[in-house]
Amino acid sequence: MKSGFSHITVLLEEAVDALSIREGGCYLDGTFGRGGHSRLILGRLGAGGILLGFDKDPQAVAAGLALATEDARFVIVQRSFAELADEMKMRGLVGKVSGVLLDLGVSSPQLDDPERGFSFLNDGPLDMRMDPGRGLSAAEWLAQASCEEIAHVFKDYGEERFARRMAQAVVQRRQERPFERTADLAQVLAAANPAWEKGKNPATRAFQGLRIHINNELGDLEQGLDAALEVLEVGGRLAVISFHSLEDRIVKRFMRRQVKGEADKLPRDLPIRPAAFEPRLKLIGKPRYASESELKTNPRARSAIMRVAEKLR
C-alpha cells in the first residue's frame, strides 16, 4: 500500500456536527477514505457507541483495518455504501442507525497516485476503478465501447459539450493502438476540444464522466440514499457531501421527495391520510459550503456542498 499521499477531509467539523453524535449511538461512515470524519466521530462517541466504515478501495480498507486495531468501537467493511442496507440487515441493525455520512467523489490519495489512473495531471495506467479487483478498467471499457456509448458517458456524466467530437477522436485513435495510459488519453481529448476553458484542463470533464461510469457512482448514490433511509432510526441524521452538480442534483431531489411525501397522489376528499404517504425526512438547516479559511488550506473543497436531513418515520 502506498502511503505518500495525504488527504484533507472536507467539511470535517461541519459534517460531524450535523450528525448530532450521541455517545451510545451507531453511526455509518459510508465513504471511509483515510478516516478523517471517522476519527472525529469516534472522538465524540462513548464507550458503548459503534462506528462502521464502508469503502470499496483496498488502500482505504487497509487504513480502516489499522484504525480498527486502535479502536474496538470501529469496524471497516469493504463494500460500497450502496450495499449498506444488506450489511446492516446481516448485523441486525436496520432501523437502529443514528447517523449516516456520505462524502462523495474521489479522495486525494486516489487522484494524486498516478498508479490509480484517475488523473490526467500525472501519467499512469488508465484504470480509474475504486476497487481495482472488480469490473472493467477505463482502458478495457474504452477498447470495446461504441462511439455512441463513449459520447453518452462524456456528455451525460462529464457534462462535456464536445462529447461526440471527443468520442470520435477516441474511436479513431484506438484503431491504431489501444489506450493504456492516462496521458495518452488526455492528449487525444485535448486535441479534440476546440474551446479550452481558462484554468481548466480540456480533458477534465471527459475524465470525470469516464470515472463516474467506470465506478457506477450515480447508480451507487441513488441506491445508497435509499439504503441510508432504510437503516436510520427515527431521529437519525443523513449528511451528504457532493462535489459536482450531477451528485448534488440526485441528493437534492431525493431529500425533497422524502420531505414532501406523497400525499399529493391521494384523492383530495380522502378523510384520512395514510401514514405511508407522510414525509419521511425533514431538512436540517440550509446547504453548507466550505468556509474561506478551509478553502485556503484545501482548494479542492471549493465545489463541496453538504445537505443534511433527519428521519421522521
Swiss-Prot record:
EC class = transferase
Instruction: Tell me which UniProt keywords the record has, alphabetically.
Output: Cytoplasm, Methyltransferase, rRNA processing, S-adenosyl-L-methionine, Transferase
Q: Which GO terms describe its biological process?
A: rRNA base methylation
Chain sites annotated for binding S-adenosyl-L-methionine: 35-37, 55, 81, 103, 110
Primary location recorded for the protein, binned into one broad class: cytoplasm
* Reaction catalysed by this enzyme: cytidine(1402) in 16S rRNA + S-adenosyl-L-methionine = N(4)-methylcytidine(1402) in 16S rRNA + S-adenosyl-L-homocysteine + H(+)
Q: Which compartments is it annotated to reside in?
A: Cytoplasm
Q: Which Pfam family, any one of them, does this sequence belong to?
A: Methyltransf_5
| Coiled-coil stretches | none
What role does it play? Specifically methylates the N4 position of cytidine in position 1402 (C1402) of 16S rRNA.
Q: Which family does it belong to?
A: Belongs to the methyltransferase superfamily. RsmH family.
State what protein this is by name: Ribosomal RNA small subunit methyltransferase H
Q: Which organism is it from?
A: Azotobacter vinelandii (strain DJ / ATCC BAA-1303)
Gene name of the record: rsmH
